[in-house]
């Protein structure tokens, strides 16, 4: 009888220990590719492919991409969101007058525990042109800076960033407007001091209104001295 009691006690202890084990983290990532367009020095639209890979529940060690035309590249990790966000910010020399290859992009993601997973994302040939910024100026009372632009054809939404040098001062969430004009309170910029500010306006074209995956993004910019 004592032996049976001992075996039962051991079984209960083992059951308790098994319940204390950590749940296995399921590595998963979100991938997206979209066409980014800007105006070059001659004012002509040029294009590049921009990629984003994000993990919400597991660190990423590396990301490699194969484009539909067979070209390969490695993505850099976000220096702030270390291990959870990888992306590329095209350099001026990466932009071409021709659109990026349309088709299926294949992403090989290596997680911190060395598990490797493959994801795909498709890119069509749809793009939008950079906005034509009409004006960037202070209001008459000096309280705000207003940026106005011509509506971007096919854009579902817009996004505005304000930079001073390489430092981002303001970044809005995507927004829609009836009249393409937005004001930024000067008090929002005062903490960064006097100097030249770059207003960077992006048009956004989504693959669908349910997922908000980007198909295309266009960016135009203009400077103002405050």
Name these PLM-found stretches.
Residues 128-138:
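Proline-enriched interdomain boundary motifs that mark the N-terminal boundary
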Residues 115-124, 209-223:
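Edge beta-strands of extracellular beta-sandwich domains
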Residues 51, 143-155:
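Conserved aromatic anchor
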Residues 39-72:
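Post-signal-peptide N-terminal segment of Sec-exported extracytoplasmic proteins
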Residues 93-102, 186-196:
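Surface-exposed, short loops/turns at beta-strand junctions within beta-sandwich domains
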Residues 12-39:
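Bacterial Sec-dependent N-terminal signal peptides
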Residues 78-95, 180-183:
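Aromatic sugar-binding surface patches on proteins
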Residues 111, 188-218:
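Beta-strand-rich modules
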């Amino acid at each position: 009888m004592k032996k049976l009691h001992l075996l039962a006690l051991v079984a209960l202890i083992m059951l308790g220990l098994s319940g204390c084990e950590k749940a296995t983290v399921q590595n998963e990532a979100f991938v997206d590719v979209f066409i980014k367009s800007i105006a070059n020095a001659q004012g002509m639209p040029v294009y590049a492919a921009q990629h984003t890979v994000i993990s919400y529940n597991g660190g990423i060690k590396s990301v490699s991409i194969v484009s539909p035309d067979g070209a390969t590249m490695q993505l850099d990790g976000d220096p702030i969101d270390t291990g959870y966000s990888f992306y590329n910010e095209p350099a001026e020399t990466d932009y071409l007058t021709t659109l990026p290859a349309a088709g299926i992009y294949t992403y090989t993601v290596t997680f911190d525990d060395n598990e490797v997973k493959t994801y795909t994302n498709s890119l069509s040939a749809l793009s939008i042109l950079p906005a034509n910024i009409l004006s960037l100026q202070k209001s008459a009372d000096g309280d705000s800076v207003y940026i106005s632009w011509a509506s971007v054809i096919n854009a579902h939404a817009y996004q505005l960033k304000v930079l001073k040098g390489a430092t981002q001062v303001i970044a809005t969430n995507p927004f829609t407007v009836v009249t393409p004009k937005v004001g930024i309170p000067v008090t929002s910029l005062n903490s960064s001091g006097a100097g030249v500010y770059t207003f960077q306006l992006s048009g956004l074209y989504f693959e669908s209104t349910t997922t908000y995956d980007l198909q295309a993004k266009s960016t135009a910019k203009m400077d103002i001295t405050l």
